[in-house]
Amino acid sequence: MNSHGRLKKSSLILAVVGFALAGCSSSSGGGSGGSTGSGGASSGAGGVGGKSGTGGSLQGGSGAGGSKASGGNTTPTTTGGAAAGGAQAGGSPAAGGNAGKGSGGSAGAGGVAQNGGAPGSGGQTGAGGTVTCTGTTPTGTSFTVDKSGVTFTVGTGKMKVQVCAADIIRVMSTSAASLPTKTSLSVSNAWDNPPAFCVDEAAGILTITTTRLKVKVTESTGIVSYTDTADTALVAESSKSASGKVVTAFTSTSDEALFGLGQQPSNNSNRKNSSVHLANSNGNIFIPMIVSNKGYGLFWDNPSAGDFSSTGTTTSYTSGAGDMVDYYFFYGPTIDQVIAGYRTTTGPAPLFGKWAYGLFQSKDHYGSQSEITTVMNGYRNGKIPVDCIVQDWDYWDPYSWGSHIMDPSRYADPKALLTSMHTNNIHGMISIWPEYQYMANPPTGAAGDQDNYNALNAMTSPTKALYTSGASHHFYDTFNAAARTLVYQQIYDKLLGKYGWDGIWADNTEPQAYPDSVDVGSQDTALGKGSTVINAYPLQHSKALYEGWRKVGPDGKRVYILTRSAWAGIQRYSAAEWSGDIQADLGTFVKQIPAGLSYGLSGMPYWTTDIGGYFGTPSEELFTRWFQFGAFCSQFRIHGQATKELYTWSTTGKANLLAVDTLHYRLMPYIYSLAWKTTNEGYTIMRHLVFDYQKDTKVYGIADQFMYGPALLVNPVITTGATSRSVYLPAGTWYEFWTGATATGGTTVTADAPLSKISLYVKAGSIIPMGPNIQYATESIDPLEIRVYKGANGSFTLYEDEGDSYNYETGKYSTITFTWDDAGKKLSIGDRNGSYTGMPASRTFNVVFVDSTHGTGADVSTTIDQVVKYDGTATSATAK
């Protein structure tokens, strides 16, 4: 009998290499094992962290894999695979390693890494035990077993259950006699190192067991069900399609909450009892990923348009085109772990340059070099923090779309403009569209106007690089590798390399047929009919930009792409998304909050909105409330057709806006550390409450509150004229940010929220590093104010690097872990791990133990409890 008391008929253990027989049991252990077993260590750039050992067991504890050697940092890849390495268990860093209680590293291919500590804090759960099997290899006419999984014959069709990792399962099925060959556009992990697993057969049911999961397949029907290792049901397929359509259906209990599917304007984030047509359009980004409050996720890997449907008993997904069902199952049990599994599958999100976590000032559109200079001076002379000014479209007029010519009559010297911006510590981003215009008679003096169009139009293999159009505008085929290479080179030659732009605004990437009507779905692409891949158009466009930049890019600059549309996996191409062209009204604003939260629950880390709306002019009150919300999105950006620069509002309005802008910049050490956590662990910064309060049924329907990182509960005001709002406080003790007053969780309170302030609460046990008042993200943040919110244990890892290079990929960064022991009233500051060029040798930490008398609000604290002079060696501070 195994450890769960069920008789085994037969079983098999499969290891990374070959087959091995061993004693039969499955033990998930305590889940606190930091690294994976020996044989799976990973270090250096591009490493895949936490590979399982070749002996077939996944070990808990502090094995050799996953932690790093003294003096260096392990890092994730930027193009796929998992976050590498990770810290030792229990919250204290290994020498040279990343610290962080419960900050578990992302899953490695075929193994799982965990830093230990509390669950729900990111990364995949540790294996925490071994899987061992006894008996003979199960045999039968309906299935075959290999080291990657089990292939079934079901009727006249085929199905494969692939064990990608201990908590990641892929299911492929078709009504054809063999599974089609497929190269996924979304999935970047090759699953070269599958984990150990057992295969058992009894009473017509074949069970695959890993250290984390049991996958049960009814051999006669191919129905798949999932349980944890204790046989607690997670989800099960409810039927197989008899029609040959690409459809999967799953059971769903009435109390289940479902989240994800990308971002669409809505008043609710819970997808239960709803139907959604999954086809990208302006304002609607669809990611075929759902997450359940029960602790699992499902990702359908099919880029055609599709349909999702949820009822009281069933969840289904139907693809509009394709020749097989292909989906991934992710097990948590926490939602952070589910999302980390998705990122392990589709690729980690690289770090943006630090500047990209500051404020973007954008408008449709700045019409000249002098206008951009005026905006720059307005911010810098007004002492208003900002990091980027954006050049929207039409800078090419009267030249052709796609020419990338900046009209010399309006932009006399773009290079000098960018030099001036950089001197003022402001970055520039420029709009690029994936379309090219044919002009039979270009404007006089437009030398080279048609060069880009002509070069693409001449490409005809394997298909035309430009889609056929009955008019003058043509989208390029992003599925054509040669076209992607050429498109980036044109952008680099005429804009990035020539003038020094720092980021790319990839507009109209659905693509929406504008200004001429072009149906991309009906076109022939390099990968077949457009209808089979249409939703992945923006993914492949971002791939062109990212891969081109990494090969031939501006020296020393990390890639930054802002795109209007997206598809699963786009995060690995250093892309953020925004919610499209929206109206400047209250109803639209209200819907932005659940839209952004849904996007994060779809596995997508970076999202923003046109603060103040795109169409129309917002009132000062609406813009202020929208701006307050925007400061706590994962990207902070003003855009629209109206004039909305912060210095253009009334004296009172400007003061209110400056207050939240200043707070955002004071939080930059916190924000940038969370950005690293996003890259390194698959974390999500802008967090629906279900991330952290998964068992609290009250949070499932809350769509206007969210966590910003682990500490801050953000409660935007969404009612005109309101000076307070109702706030639900989840379990625990909470501090009102502005006053330091405490409240007990599990209750609803009325929070003060005049127009000058957004309602914010801080969870007890939080540690928030705050910098001085700064004007741009890379300005010096010494001294650091370390705010400690007593009442519970807690920790926070401060991450720092050069700010805008890829040296972090080779371990050039530092981490310092702060740990609060509430019972002992002691803040421990760990050794600094790692180093980077320009790292200060010493730091000043102004420690503040927050209460109602000090350490409150956005201003720099004048009452300091303890000044710590830090030289990189562990030290501490004690509360009185």
Cite the ranges covered by each PLM segment.
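Aromatic- and carboxylate-enriched substrate-binding clefts and catalytic-loop regions
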Residues: 249, 385-657, 692-694
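Bacterial N-terminal signal peptides that target proteins for export
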Residues: 2-13
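A low-complexity, Ser/Thr/Gly/Pro-enriched, surface-exposed linker/loop concept
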Residues: 133-140, 162-206, 243-246
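Catalytic core of carbohydrate-active enzymes
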Residues: 547-554, 559, 566-578, 591-592, ...
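Catalytic and substrate-binding clefts that recognize carbohydrates or anionic sugar/phosphate headgroups
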Residues: 199-354, 363-365, 369, 376-381, ...
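Conserved, mostly hydrophobic/aromatic
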Residues: 161, 212, 289, 379, ...
